[in-house]
Amino acid sequence: QRVLDALNRIGGCGLENLKITGATEQDGYRNKVQYPVQEQNGRAEAGFFSAGTHRVIPIAHCRIQPDCADAIRAAVLRWMAQYKIRAYDEKTGRGYIRHIYIRRGAVSGETLVCISANCKQLPRSAELTAAIRAAAPDVTSIVFTPNEKKGNTILGDTFLPLYGPGWIQDTLCGLTFRLSPAAFYQVNHDQAEILYRKALQFAALTGTETVLDLYCGTGTITLCLAREAGRAVGVEVVPQAIEDAKENAKRNGLAD
């Protein structure tokens, strides 16, 4: 209903109803999860913010997250407890660990873990890497992002690999994509494929057009369009996403 209201109010479409294409997977479909970390009663907890607040509600499991997420989250919290590494306190600006970020390739099965922390060098990083790999052997990249900004910003501006290349790859609509921590990628892989194919159908490209893809992220839509248009141009403000997009164009033989 919100989408319908927005289309009518903002787009002036005059629609009475929308046909919904339902998702085939209701559980475990989300390929990315971000847990804020917070000190509660003398121990670090990770979960999700309570609605309208910055108070973390600890969780044991979330049905829509990747299967590996629980083990990774628990491993990080155990590491924090073992080495007395404090969670970041948004009010005082003290403490270290801010967020646990996990991204998993739906097709590739590759998994990236990114730790956001309020420091330039992550203490006990070797022990953290060992703990995560022991808990989730399919993790292929572990990254530390220094984030000393005030507030609750999730990621910093730089990404330092602790293990692996610092990115994962996945396949979408027959194309292979490199995915870095800061780059946008649709969180529901299967529905993204349905969405992209429907967009291509509506575009009805003949092979002569120049297509502009604004806020292109890693270039997923841009490259899907490039196969059917005369020329496709992606525009993005996130530097890491652009680097991924250029690499993805090369990987798929679609670079100019």
Regions found by a protein language model. Give the residues of each.
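Rossmann-like S-adenosyl-L-methionine
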Residues: 124-256
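SAM-dependent transferase fold signal centered on methyltransferase-like domains
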Residues: 1-160, 201-208
